[in-house]
Amino acid sequence: MNKKSYMKIGILLMVGLFICAGCSAQQGGKYTVEDLDNLAEIKIYSAENNELIKTISDEEQLYQYNQCSLYDDSDTEEHQHKLEKDLEGAKEQYYMISYKYPVARFGGEELVENTTITLYEDKNIIKMTVSGESIKGFSVPEEFLVFYYEVSEEEMNFYHSLVEW
């Protein structure tokens, strides 16, 4: 494998860690910042006019959002290109931008953009763009921060329910 493939695999692993929350939270209880993997809020925008539709900060919804399993270790560079090609001409429907609490305990308390998930009309493929500012310590070229995933109908219904909740 070449250096490019190793970098993509490394970033996919990091993204998996960003998205997956620990299983230690108990249902019905209050979630800690760690349970939510530092996720603070999600803003949902219409892709048609970039209008803010909704801001989600409810802990239960944030926890469920974190539980969506986007990472598929069978994804290869070729599969990513196939999914990207499958989206050609597809109409973007919503942007879901997730924000996390800053890692530093001191200093700015401004939320940090983490990922943007793009939903498409009549497609079970989503595009996830990792924000460059969410990766500390080194710069990653933008082309390595965009991932495509086929999601189940159940997961797609969940994403759409966030818009309607």
Regions found by a protein language model. Name each.
Residues N2-G10:
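Bacterial N-terminal signal peptides that target proteins for export
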Residues G10-L12, E78:
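Inter-domain helical "communication" segments and dimerization helices
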